[in-house]
């Protein structure tokens, strides 16, 4: 499968110039309202002050896997919108942490073969631990920033972070499925960016920001900007190291 991949750092834009149309979010996922100011959350990669302020408004986790950011409008500019497919991944930082992953997704990037093993990749903060109250037992998954079904990336260490089972399947997957279904049905492109958000020097991301906008129809088909929490109900996580323990109320 031939791919065009851009290299180099990805720069965030300041604000979306054109508002997206209304989009129904994945079923069984309710949006959260901003209930108060959160501490500033830093990220690996280049980020504007305006964008950081937007993320600072994300409320603390409260029983929903994601929160809507910036009124659900992604921070893409008109110059970002293109019908040329590409993928771009940030270099790992000195702590081995992933940065921003961005792509203009099209049918030509989607996989034509089954996924290969990714077990050899150990993302920052990786721990192998099981809990009986976690679906599949394992607390952590190797979470693709840009899902395999969208770009066919296998053991790409620049695209895999330590993420909870809950974030992977309840938070990220419904949005990935929505984008994949749209591309298959229309043949259109979707501009897509996922930013892992690390607090200070933590090795495990507190969450990921997912942004997407369909290109040919200017966001009428796909348009979202959400923050997905890297949490697991019933489990306490030390984001500095990846270590964890069951909450007392679940014992």
Predicted segments with their positions:
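Bacterial signal peptide processing site
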Residues: 21-24
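Domain-level detector of nuclease and nuclease-like folds
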Residues: 78-251
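Bacterial N-terminal signal peptides that target proteins for export
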Residues: 1-9
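Cross-kingdom leucine-rich repeat
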Residues: 10-14
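C-terminal motif of bacterial Sec signal peptides marking the signal peptidase cleavage site
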Residues: 16-19
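N-terminal module-boundary/linker segments of secreted carbohydrate-active enzymes
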Residues: 30-91
